[in-house]
């Protein structure tokens, strides 16, 4: 037996450790590899650079409202391809694909519940559903949210994350801008607070309607907010845009929004503002945070 064969015979192969898919993810901004459970615990905010990643509509609502208080509204409403629209793909096929990918019927989820014990109605966009585009179902669900807030005599909160009106529904989509704005006008007559939270991105017909009609317009850090996108504007005016143009920090300097709030601080900030507006006792900041349930972070992180 040669010396090479003797060495090979004494080698014991080790089993390669397998890491379940989805345990690790990467920050979109700084590129840092992050432990998925830790990121979820931090509400999809990078602990290294504070970049606010996109959050699903349901996780956002569960992180906001008191655990056990959530009741979904308008879940029976489903989109229809009334125009038999087709571009490079049939609209009904795009809907089916988005529904399968996200598990949602459309791009807006509405729930009622309590926030630190205070009754509220909250809506959140699912950006992964066709870019959070606004069609007839989104408009109908938003109006349902407004009507429920009036019925319960409570505030309304909406988290926007949308590319704008849904082109596949043409005029029916554009009509939702007027429909939602008219519904909010009735709510304003009742003197009920409506707080709009602008997240990345809030663009097009959504930013031109109910997203900017809040009694208070709050934005998350570095959120892209506007009508047309920066690239489209640059190509139209043939000029270089200012740094941070259309970002929330730029907008607050120009007086277009009221405040910027980090996501981990959003729940208490909203509750404090609404308590003042509704003449209710201030929320207890020491109360345990309820909401989205994430797996506990192990004592030791798995090896990358």
From Swiss-Prot:
Task: Using the UniProt annotation, give all residue ranges assigned to the region (Disordered).
Answer: 284-304
Which PANTHER family does this chain map to?
ACETYL-COENZYME A CARBOXYLASE CARBOXYL TRANSFERASE SUBUNIT BETA, CHLOROPLASTIC (PTHR42995:SF5)
One GO term in the molecular function aspect is:
carboxyl- or carbamoyltransferase activity
ZnF (C4-type) intervals: 27-49
Q: Where is the composition biased (Pro residues)?
A: 295-304
Q: What protein name does the entry list?
A: Acetyl-coenzyme A carboxylase carboxyl transferase subunit beta
| Gene for this chain | accD
Query: Does the record carry Chloroplast as a key word?
Result: no
Q: Which HAMAP family match?
A: AcetylCoA_CT_beta
- What EC number(s) are associated with this protein in UniProt? 2.1.3.15
